[in-house]
């Protein structure tokens, strides 16, 4: 009896195990069948959508205007080339429109497709008006996305890198601001056939990623959107425009240009504190500073396009050059008057010639005796001369000529009044110029000169 019960339990356990395995196998088969059914349904929907579809014709042809809604997500902005007046931007460009021919009904509400389907349906012929070169990314496959909803609304997204023109006004360089446009629209369809609109409100239609700035010399202040109509010989076309507002960073130019110019001007004014007789030293100061300013002015223009007007930096360099050249002219003036022997009051200084002193004759006891003659008669040999020697005795005595008190002579080892005046005038004028210059440009409100589409 016990053996029978054990056998029954074993049979019951085996039956449960077989039942579980059977249900699991049936579930897997059911899932595979369901997946196979979904794939089949998906394929049938696509085949039915493309059956009789002509991608050469726009949606609503002859009935309505095709509305294309767009928005842009900027993944990378920059770099910006001042010399070529262009910038590079990497974007996800999204377009959405409605095509009633692509309506469908099925278990899914959205068909998520790739670029293969995009080539079989009608898509807008959008191009960039100010684009110099546009590249659609194809690695590892074309970076395109297509989604079709059951009511026939399509979302078409692609990744693009665009190099576009950016007209720049460099009058305020390097304190300038710019509005770089990105213009796009239909190439073949006029506004009577295809119109463009922004998907969202203007503030959200164009978004820049937080880490999307690739700018070394600019700050991206923001972006604005606009739309307009452009008239051409083939009709009127809708043009969508996005302006990216840029402000230049001045730090690089302060280090590379402004500070060297200021130091060069200060160095040229050091010569005012040297003696006017130090011709070699003052000449070296003047010539060296002039050549330095010439080199700085040339290097400052290398990174800029050859514009026909003067920039703010050009005016600063020109004034600094004028100060340096004026310091050299000032030394030439001082040296001219020094060589001519003229002082500041206009009186000439004539060096006094030394007077010749003649040997005087001294009269003594009605007898002239040469003061510088040393004559001793030999009285022993000539006794007759004893009497003469008594009456005419030679007294060798040095007689000093009468001299007048010397007048104080003017010396040239002094400071010129021109130098004294220049020591005050040059630094004062240069300081006033810097005060006016920086106050004018740094406190100026940015004036964004953005070209507007023709209405």
Curated annotation (Swiss-Prot):
Q: What is its main location?
A: membrane
Annotated 4-aminobutanoate binding lies at 94, 157
Entry-listed glycosylation sites: 38, 138
Between which residues do disulfide bridges form?
Answer: 166-180
Q: Name one GO molecular function term.
A: GABA-gated chloride ion channel activity
Record gene name: GABRA1
Q: Which domain of life is it from?
A: Eukaryota
Q: What is this protein called?
A: Gamma-aminobutyric acid receptor subunit alpha-1
> What does the record give as the function of this protein?
Alpha subunit of the heteropentameric ligand-gated chloride channel gated by gamma-aminobutyric acid (GABA), a major inhibitory neurotransmitter in the brain. GABA-gated chloride channels, also named GABA(A) receptors (GABAAR), consist of five subunits arranged around a central pore and contain GABA active binding site(s) located at the alpha and beta subunit interface(s). When activated by GABA, GABAARs selectively allow the flow of chloride anions across the cell membrane down their electrochemical gradient.
User: Could you tell me the membrane topology recorded for this protein?
Assistant: Multi-pass membrane protein
Q: Which CDD domains match?
A: LGIC_ECD_GABAAR_A1, LGIC_TM_GABAAR_alpha
Query: Which Pfam family, giving just one, matches this sequence?
Result: Neur_chan_memb
Alphabetized, the UniProt keywords read: Cell membrane, Chloride, Chloride channel, Disulfide bond, Glycoprotein, Ion channel, Ion transport, Ligand-gated ion channel, Membrane, Postsynaptic cell membrane, Receptor, Signal, Synapse, Transmembrane, Transmembrane helix, Transport
